[in-house]
Amino acid sequence: MSAAIAATARPAAEMRTRALYDLPLPELMFRAQAVHRAHFDACSVETAQLLSIKTGGCPEDCGYCSQSAHHDTGVAATRLMDVEAVLAEARKAKAAGAARFCMGAAWRAPKDRDMDAVCAMISGVRALGLETCVTLGMLTPAQVDRLSAAGLDYYNHNVDTSPAYYPRITSTRTLDDRLETLGHVRAGGIKVCCGGIVGMGETIEDRLAMLELLAGLDPHPESVPLNMWTPIDGTPVKAFEEKVDPIAFVRLVAVARLLMPRSVVRLSAGRHTLSDEAQALCFLAGANSIFVGDTLLTTPNMEESRDAVLLARLGLRPAPAQPSA
């Protein structure tokens, strides 16, 4: 589906989504929890850990990102990590209870010369019994084939925001560029991890249009990360950031669950700003995945000890790893 088609989504569908969002909270939560229980174990939460394998120096100008070479954020550019160093971090993640190991590189697109190392990382992490996910930027079909052959389970490539708001966030690529890569990933047999970010000055309508865009992908993404933008000095978005109301975020999670019943909905960046009570509401609304570990690329995350206490308080248990066959 192109961005042009997404931008002209049927008004009736948009009205239905807004009507869901505006339901009295108890009714919205009841509907979302019912759908969630129809497809998932309501007491199981997926745990993933994210490692930046190549930080900073990205040529894209994404207004929310600390790793863009266009912004003065104090993030130093690094080279691609050695394979063994990545595998050492993956072992630590597994020992700490993570079921999926996600690796992110600050590239517009990977160079073919880097693919051998990335594929070795994927194969090595998979050999540890962990699910694998990478986010490397835009891909060619040939690169997708290499990642698939290495055993990659998931590829993350977010749509970021609504089609209408997208040009305000970045100018070095289009939403159609993102959707093209998602098409390559899907055609290559790799599961899709695709979500977005809220709190960048967008409207409620933009947030819901983003969910409509995700729900319009056929099939739905297997994994949908929902991020709350974390303030980063030196980024353009810092000038018009908006703190997301926790209840508004809970509503967004519930609508995501209703629109994409079989997708795993992940509480991603910004989760550390939510109280335990707000996170509990998110789980009731249908969220069933979290990032563990103290950092997400270059931004803070929940402390591991706080996560363990929270899951225990709520009676939730980490889901086991399920690498693709």
Curated annotation (Swiss-Prot):
<feature type="binding site">
    <location>
        <position position="102"/>
    </location>
    <ligand>
        <name>[2Fe-2S] cluster</name>
    </ligand>
</feature>
<feature type="binding site">
    <location>
        <position position="193"/>
    </location>
    <ligand>
        <name>[2Fe-2S] cluster</name>
    </ligand>
</feature>
<feature type="binding site">
    <location>
        <position position="65"/>
    </location>
    <ligand>
        <name>[4Fe-4S] cluster</name>
    </ligand>
</feature>
<dbReference type="GO" id="GO:0009102">
    <property type="term" value="P:biotin biosynthetic process"/>
</dbReference>
<dbReference type="Pfam" id="PF04055">
    <property type="entry name" value="Radical_SAM"/>
</dbReference>
<feature type="domain" description="Radical SAM core">
    <location>
        <begin position="43"/>
        <end position="262"/>
    </location>
</feature>
<keyword id="KW-0408">Iron</keyword>
<dbReference type="InterPro" id="IPR007197">
    <property type="entry name" value="rSAM"/>
</dbReference>
<dbReference type="GO" id="GO:0051537">
    <property type="term" value="F:2 iron, 2 sulfur cluster binding"/>
</dbReference>
<keyword id="KW-0479">Metal-binding</keyword>
<dbReference type="InterPro" id="IPR010722">
    <property type="entry name" value="BATS_dom"/>
</dbReference>
<comment type="subunit">
    <text>Homodimer.</text>
</comment>
<protein>
    <recommendedName>
        <fullName>Biotin synthase</fullName>
        <ecNumber>2.8.1.6</ecNumber>
    </recommendedName>
</protein>
<comment type="similarity">
    <text>Belongs to the radical SAM superfamily. Biotin synthase family.</text>
</comment>
<dbReference type="InterPro" id="IPR013785">
    <property type="entry name" value="Aldolase_TIM"/>
</dbReference>
<comment type="pathway">
    <text>Cofactor biosynthesis; biotin biosynthesis; biotin from 7,8-diaminononanoate: step 2/2.</text>
</comment>
<dbReference type="InterPro" id="IPR006638">
    <property type="entry name" value="Elp3/MiaA/NifB-like_rSAM"/>
</dbReference>
<dbReference type="GO" id="GO:0005506">
    <property type="term" value="F:iron ion binding"/>
</dbReference>
<dbReference type="InterPro" id="IPR024177">
    <property type="entry name" value="Biotin_synthase"/>
</dbReference>
<dbReference type="Pfam" id="PF06968">
    <property type="entry name" value="BATS"/>
</dbReference>
<keyword id="KW-0004">4Fe-4S</keyword>
<comment type="function">
    <text>Catalyzes the conversion of dethiobiotin (DTB) to biotin by the insertion of a sulfur atom into dethiobiotin via a radical-based mechanism.</text>
</comment>
<keyword id="KW-0949">S-adenosyl-L-methionine</keyword>
<dbReference type="GO" id="GO:0004076">
    <property type="term" value="F:biotin synthase activity"/>
</dbReference>
<feature type="binding site">
    <location>
        <position position="58"/>
    </location>
    <ligand>
        <name>[4Fe-4S] cluster</name>
    </ligand>
</feature>
<dbReference type="InterPro" id="IPR002684">
    <property type="entry name" value="Biotin_synth/BioAB"/>
</dbReference>
<dbReference type="GO" id="GO:0051539">
    <property type="term" value="F:4 iron, 4 sulfur cluster binding"/>
</dbReference>
<feature type="binding site">
    <location>
        <position position="133"/>
    </location>
    <ligand>
        <name>[2Fe-2S] cluster</name>
    </ligand>
</feature>
<feature type="binding site">
    <location>
        <position position="62"/>
    </location>
    <ligand>
        <name>[4Fe-4S] cluster</name>
    </ligand>
</feature>
<keyword id="KW-0808">Transferase</keyword>
<feature type="binding site">
    <location>
        <position position="266"/>
    </location>
    <ligand>
        <name>[2Fe-2S] cluster</name>
    </ligand>
</feature>
<keyword id="KW-0001">2Fe-2S</keyword>
<keyword id="KW-0411">Iron-sulfur</keyword>
<keyword id="KW-0093">Biotin biosynthesis</keyword>
